[in-house]
């Protein structure tokens, strides 16, 4: 199990799991994202940032932050955990290229928005993404909800474009 090793030796963790559509519903199934938080957070000690990459409904990151805070309190581990949302924009067949050379980087943190709180996520993101940022890749820092909405909107726009071209 790599999770205890990751918890012990990393202070940045990425969640990139599927969020399929729920059966008989249009809602996203976020149980896999939630499971990562439930499994990882109790093993953490020290300062940690978790970047969510998955497409999730607006409000999920804030709910995951509340869950992480509750797990830290429940397990009594000496950890601070910050959830940030950093959606990916990968084209089919270009995943590696789009990861190394993204056309934009979006980061949602709790340090932005109507009730800002101190955030370590932006500084860490600037370190992680230093190579593309050095090439002037747009870096958009916003609140959690807006970052989630940017990804959902991009997916909806792509689906609309595909529907229109299929109709032609």
Features from the language model and the residues they span:
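Short glycine-/small-residue-rich Rossmann-like dinucleotide-binding loops
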Residues: 17-19, 55, 111
